[in-house]
């Protein structure tokens, strides 16, 4: 007779699986609640204490850390000396292990969790058994996922045993499982210890789906989510309509979400290739849409739209007239959803953008052979902290417009220039190797919309005074930029020459 050790918290489909094991001549060893559950289901089980000849001690901290368990798991069946040792020590081999780990992740997801409670939910015996079983995969089947039950049942029925290929795959899966578990623990404890830059960085992500392709059709791609995702992450969006999100869709949607969360009032962000092409703000979301569309009615075609208010029918009917890839909003009125869903391919995503008191986590960027890690670019964008550096100071209304433009330029690829008025962006110059070209592009896009309310924002300092001169000659009345150039005085002098008000934020917003 073969022996299986079963100790799980996830009881889904457990009884049929264990009954199948019994049907194939397994005796069942179990612990605590799992044993009681199986006994009540009419399945005969053996307690772990009967196997170890030792009681559970230290409030359950020591149950399975015992040679009768690990000897039965680690003994290599093809080695006579191993099997002789088992016989001498009266240890029965264990042929299958099915174990869930303590719910550490669920524990630390509770904002009220204490360090003591978190530590008590660090599993020791479970990972030890899983690792022992996975190491000895040639002789032991190891199961960590209820989704694998059905396939194992089928294989037992068809072949009477689990193949070496399956055992090896389950072993690899188990080591991924325990590594991810330990990574969460390491990350949590490192944060509790105030370790911002640990010498070993452990990250864990869960596969959401395989993708049709990546950035281009010849590239394979997969979509993973952080094991502890943010509530407002694209990974948490609920898809209400449309085709499956593509690799590029997800990156664009992420950029749109980051941008729209900057704004408190009703705002619409239109985005293409991770750059905003139009941002509109108003007292209501319909008018904000009108302004975002007006900002660049050409580039918005095939774009991603993020709205930070519920989508009503009037707004939906206007958006329905265009070809759009994605619309993201916190809510959709029923009639608005009905209208937009008429386009079967239009991806509609529902996601709460509310600014919650979540921890601001670091973000990573992949490079060849490594990664870069940095704090997120989040800062209180408060004009009260800005410095007026010119003879003319911006008016209160200009300051509000400068703040709007400053938030917009923050989410535009460097070198970035945004021209805006108090209602919308007028022109966006993104991703140019030099700042004067970005300035010219932004002002060209603004065109006839330039008026005495137009302001300009630059994500980094002006290396020379040419951008200020060009902006002033085209009617810009106020400028916001970080400052910090060795030639700041030249830019200030040029602004004074044309009577342009200019403020320094002291903060740069490069975006690569």
Curated annotation (Swiss-Prot):
It catalyses: (6R)-10-formyltetrahydrofolate + 5-amino-1-(5-phospho-beta-D-ribosyl)imidazole-4-carboxamide = 5-formamido-1-(5-phospho-D-ribosyl)imidazole-4-carboxamide + (6S)-5,6,7,8-tetrahydrofolate; IMP + H2O = 5-formamido-1-(5-phospho-D-ribosyl)imidazole-4-carboxamide. GO terms for cellular component: cytosol. It comes from the Bacteria. Disulfide bonds: none annotated. SMART domains: AICARFT_IMPCHas, MGS. CDD domains: IMPCH. Keywords: Hydrolase, Multifunctional enzyme, Purine biosynthesis, Transferase. Signal peptide: none annotated. Residues 1-144 form the MGS-like domain. One of its GO terms (biological process) is 'de novo' IMP biosynthetic process. Its EC number is 2.1.2.3, 3.5.4.10. Pathway: Purine metabolism; IMP biosynthesis via de novo pathway; 5-formamido-1-(5-phospho-D-ribosyl)imidazole-4-carboxamide from 5-amino-1-(5-phospho-D-ribosyl)imidazole-4-carboxamide (10-formyl THF route): step 1/1; Purine metabolism; IMP biosynthesis via de novo pathway; IMP from 5-formamido-1-(5-phospho-D-ribosyl)imidazole-4-carboxamide: step 1/1. One of its GO terms (molecular function) is IMP cyclohydrolase activity. Coiled coil: none annotated. The IMP cyclohydrolase activity resides in the N-terminal region. Belongs to the PurH family. This is Bifunctional purine biosynthesis protein PurH. The gene is purH.
């Amino acid at each position: 007779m073969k022996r299986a050790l079963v100790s799980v918290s996830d009881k889904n489909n457990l009884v049929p699986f264990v009954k199948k094991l019994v049907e194939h001549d397994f005796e069942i060893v179990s612990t605590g609640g799992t044993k009681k559950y199986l006994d009540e289901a009419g399945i005969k089980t053996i307690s772990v204490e009967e196997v170890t000849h030792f009681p559970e001690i230290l409030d359950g901290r020591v149950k399975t850390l015992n040679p009768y368990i690990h000897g039965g798991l680690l003994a290599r069946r093809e080695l006579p000396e191993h099997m002789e040792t088992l016989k001498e020590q009266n240890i029965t081999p264990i042929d299958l292990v099915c174990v869930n780990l303590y719910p550490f992740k669920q524990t630390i997801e509770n904002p009220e969790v204490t360090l003591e409670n978190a530590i008590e939910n660090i599993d020791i015996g479970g990972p030890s058994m899983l690792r022992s079983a996975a190491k000895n995969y040639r002789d032991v089947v190891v199961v960590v996922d209820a989704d694998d039950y059905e396939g194992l049942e089928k294989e037992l029925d068809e072949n009477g045993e689990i193949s070496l290929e399956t055992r090896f795959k389950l072993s690899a899966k188990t080591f991924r499982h325990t590594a991810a578990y330990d990574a969460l623990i390491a990350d949590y404890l490192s944060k509790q210890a105030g370790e911002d830059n640990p010498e070993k960085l452990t990250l864990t992500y869960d596969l959401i789906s395989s993708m049709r392709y990546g950035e281009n059709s010849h590239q394979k791609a997969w979509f993973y989510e952080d094991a502890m995702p943010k509530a407002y992450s694209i990974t948490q969006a609920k898809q209400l309509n449309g085709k499956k999100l593509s690799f590029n869709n997800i990156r664009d949607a992420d950029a749109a979400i980051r941008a729209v969360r900057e704004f408190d009032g009703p705002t619409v962000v239109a985005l293409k290739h991770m750059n905003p092409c139009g941002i509109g703000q108003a007292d209501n979301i319909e008018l904000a849409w009108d302004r975002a569309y007006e900002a660049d009615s050409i580039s918005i075609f095939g774009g991603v739209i993020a709205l930070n208010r519920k989508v009503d029918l009037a707004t939906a009917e206007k958006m329905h007239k265009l070809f759009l890839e994605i619309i993201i909003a916190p809510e959709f009125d029923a009639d608005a959803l009905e209208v937009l869903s008429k386009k079967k391919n239009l991806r509609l995503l529902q996601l709460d953008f509310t600014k919650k008191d979540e921890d601001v986590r670091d973000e990573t960027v992949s490079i060849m052979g490594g990664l870069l890690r940095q704090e997120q670019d989040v800062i209180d964008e408060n004009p009260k902290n800005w410095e007026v550096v010119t003879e003319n100071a911006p008016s209160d209304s200009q300051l509000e417009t400068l703040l709007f433009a400053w938030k917009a330029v923050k989410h535009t690829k460097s070198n970035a220039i945004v021209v805006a008025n108090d209602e919308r962006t007028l022109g966006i110059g993104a991703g140019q190797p030099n700042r004067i070209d970005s300035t010219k592009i932004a002002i060209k896009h603004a065109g006839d919309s330039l008026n005495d309310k137009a302001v300009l924002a630059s994500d980094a300092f002006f290396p020379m005074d040419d951008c200020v001169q060009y902006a002033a000659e085209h009617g810009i009345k106020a400028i916001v930029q970080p400052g910090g150039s060795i030639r700041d005085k030249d830019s200030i002098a040029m602004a004074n020459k044309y009577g342009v008000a200019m403020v320094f934020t002291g903060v740069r917003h490069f975006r690569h």
